[in-house]
Swiss-Prot record:
Any GO CC annotation of this UniProt entry: cytoplasm
The gene coding this protein: efp
PANTHER family (UniProt xref): ELONGATION FACTOR P, ELONGATION FACTOR P (EF-P) FAMILY PROTEIN
Listed pathway(s): Protein biosynthesis; polypeptide chain elongation
Stated role: Involved in peptide bond synthesis. Stimulates efficient translation and peptide-bond synthesis on native or reconstituted 70S ribosomes in vitro. Probably functions indirectly by altering the affinity of the ribosome for aminoacyl-tRNA, thus increasing their reactivity as acceptors for peptidyl transferase.
UniProt protein name: Elongation factor P
GO biological process, any: peptide biosynthetic process
Length: 188
């Protein structure tokens, strides 16, 4: 059983008999009255988003989900294709099922696929991934204002704010929980 104090991004809970994943949450302690938790949830079966508020201390069941480690293979018209390293079984997932995880998938990336009632419903990516910059404006020599950033589009389509010295072809480490630039791994 989980309580509202256990909430974190990515936590899976049962609500009204359906499995949900917590997309975002905020613990609120008003000056007057009891504290509560405001959440944004995504239904793991339908992909629908739900905003809900829970009283402090409310309890939730843990959904019966099975985790399988798989590798991302490729994307085609059937969806995003993954393969189990143990059984070599292949599955395809839609963009809706993947949600934000689709922006972090690169060939052969090891991920954890969540199954609920034998259906792939979600994909957990590593905490940080390395992505190549596909497009960004060139950095101008001498243009080094402290903390300044520019937009960069990664190989997967993700747009990230990066420091001015980053160029196309650079490999960057991206935090998958926030979608933000962490560091440059290698230069072109």
């Amino acid at each position: 059983m989980y309580e509202t104090s256990d909430f974190r991004k990515g936590l899976k809970i049962m609500l009204e008999g359906k499995p949900y994943v917590i997309v975002d949450f905020q613990h609120v302690k008003p000056g007057k009255g009891n504290q509560f938790t405001r959440t944004k949830l995504r239904n793991m079966l339908t992909g629908q988003n739900l905003e809900s508020t829970f009283k402090s201390g409310e309890k939730f069941e843990v959904p019966n989900v099975e985790n399988k480690e798989m590798s991302f293979l490729y994307k085609d018209d059937t969806g995003y294709n993954f393969m189990s390293q143990e059984t070599f079984e292949q599955i395809a997932m839609s963009e809706e099922d993947l949600g934000e995880a689709k922006y972090y998938l690169t060939e052969n990336l090891k991920v954890v696929i969540l199954f609920y009632n034998e259906k792939a419903v979600a994909c957990d990516v590593p905490k940080a991934v390395n992505l190549t910059v596909a497009q960004t404006d060139p950095g101008i020599k001498g243009d080094r204002v402290t903390g300044a950033t520019k937009p960069a589009t990664m190989e997967t389509g993700l747009t990230v704010g990066v420091p001015l010295h980053i160029n196309e072809g650079d490999v960057l480490r991206i935090d998958t929980s926030t979608g933000e630039y962490v560091e440059r791994v290698s230069q072109k």
